[in-house]
Amino acid sequence: MNDDRLRLDLAALADEVSPVDLRDRALRTSRRLGVQRAVATSAAAVVMLGAATGTAFALMPRDDGPAPVPATTPSTTLTPTPTPSEATPTTTASPEAAVSSGAAGPTATIGRVFYGPQRSAEGAGPVRLWSFRPGSEPVRLLSVPTDAAISNAVVSPDGERVAWVDDSSYLHVADVDGTDARTYRGNLVDPDCWTPAWAPDSQRVTVSRVVSAEPSMVTEVGVVELSSGKFTRIGDLRGCHPLWSADGKVLAFPDASSGRVTLTDQYGRKGRSVPNLGGNADRSCFDVASLSPDGSRIALRLRGPGEESGDVARELDVNAVLDTRTGRKLDLELGGRKLLQAYFQADGTLVARVGVGDRNVLVLLDGDGRKISETPEPTSLKGQQILGVAD
């Protein structure tokens, strides 16, 4: 068998165990089974692809499809490859704000809010992301696959880049206007559970890669240095949808089984759980959205007794903000309006999205939950969900 035939056979086998099948099955089963199947499917593909590519992440020119549409600790190497893309005007990023505990003054403002499709829009085709800064019109950004936009796409803290994992479990990074698109190959990464999370320097992301499937399942969580593709393992972590605090010192994630939320340091050590959440408590959490700059507060989706845990897919809905040290629910000055989503900014303020009639409103709160200001959200964005907020 010649080399070309071998590569074709391996590619065909990998297609048969594509993570697309995992996604469909995971969405029809319990969260725990979904996580197990996610790992199993990705690992099987890695074993077959490994014969041709090895275990190193490789950044190579992307040749498996169109680039994103522009807008008019042991380590291994995941080498990035630039993807040619059409030059287009770029949006302007504001300077990164200093990290604060949340004692914001009256001059605090809402930064750039980034939007993507809601879960009801799942599909195979590409979809545009958008940004909105109060006082300006919404800006159309790059397009990414719909499933990735819903399940794992995440905007960097500086608002300059987007990271996502595609249907083949490859990590992608591109500027928000679609330029400088890169695909990281060689290892498959988890697209559904341990989804990408940016480091506060906007130069690294944490991912979970599948190392092998035989004789037993082996996965590892680590950090990818995007400039070089270097992958460094950070700990034996098990959970979903991680968040990284703006001060760089805290990782937070649901454990995906008992309803607990775990916090560790940036190296995956010194683990603790949010009190009175999960296990035998009457509240649980399987979905988190945002972590305060120092890791002391977290915006999440609380579930009550007997409430279904949902599936493995990411949910960005928020109905509470908790103190991670006490488990106490923070009182938010929202005027009786329903909380839909919430994101912390690097200065410690909180951007809360609330529903008001036929449109939504963005409310800026200080670190104690007191209202600073609010602004109506454009009606064109009502059917979108917020993916993040950058200063």
Where are these regions (language model features)?
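Short coil/turn segments at the loop-to-beta-strand junctions that recur within blades
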Residues: P145-I150, N187-C193, D236-P242, L277-F286, ...
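Short loop/turn segments that connect beta-strands within beta-propeller blades
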Residues: R133-E137, D175-T179, V224-G229, D265-R269, ...
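Blade-level signature of beta-propeller repeat domains, shared across WD40, Kelch, NHL, RCC1
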Residues: V356-D391
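Beta-propeller fold detector
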Residues: V139-V144, R182-N187, F231-D236, G271-G278, ...
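N-terminal low-complexity, Pro/Thr-rich disordered segments
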Residues: A56-G123, A313, G383-D391
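Blade-terminus and WD-like Trp-Asp/Gly-His loop motifs, strongest in beta-propeller folds
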Residues: G102-I110, N152-R161, P196-V205, P242-L251, ...
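Short, solvent-exposed loop/turn segments at conserved positions within beta-propeller repeat blades
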Residues: A121-G125, W164-D166, A213-T219, P254-S258, ...
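N-terminal export/targeting signals for secretion/compartment entry
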Residues: M1-P82
